[in-house]
Amino acid sequence: MDGKIQTSLRPTNTPWNKGRITGQKRPLKPKDVWAIRIRLQLKHQVCDLALFNLAIDSKLRGCDLVRLQVEDVCAGGRVRDRATIIQKKTGRPVQFEITEQTRASIQAWLPKVTARDGKYLFPSRFRAQLHLSTRQYARIVHAWVESAGLDGSAYGTHSMRRTKAAQIYKKTGNLRAVQLLLGHTKLESTVRYLGIEVDDALSISEQVEL
């Protein structure tokens, strides 16, 4: 030892989240959902409209949404009212509804999918035999929210998953129903996912006067 302080020659790593807004992504408000939907309709973006509507209805994680196959949501050339898939993360089944306007948008998109002889509902935009990647999906979501004048850094693919779930909870207060729709195994996961603990506590407190 020569008495000198030895300094590390390793380069300093920049934290991945430096300069980024992190944390839970916000759900879209109903007015934002309609703003995006109308823009997609006006621009005749058939694929994006089907993807957006199904993302809202299904409440699926991005990894499950992009892996959907035509046969998951269609039977005999018609779009189902309800569908069930096995979640990639948990290996458990989850069921979701497909509303009338979502069925119509998927039905409009189907001819282009079947024309490619593809099995995936949303094929990759670069390789037709593969499904849309989660990274591609994230970029699409970013474009959607910015087209509606929203801050792209505050929203993400989980915003699509949380949007309808948040509205269902807001209107019904039924956490168990939301848990089932999101495919969570524990109710605590749903509570954390919706970020409702503080809001609920304050709402209860506001109703008590002393």
What are these regions (language model features)?
Residues 1-210:
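Conserved catalytic core of the tyrosine transesterase superfamily
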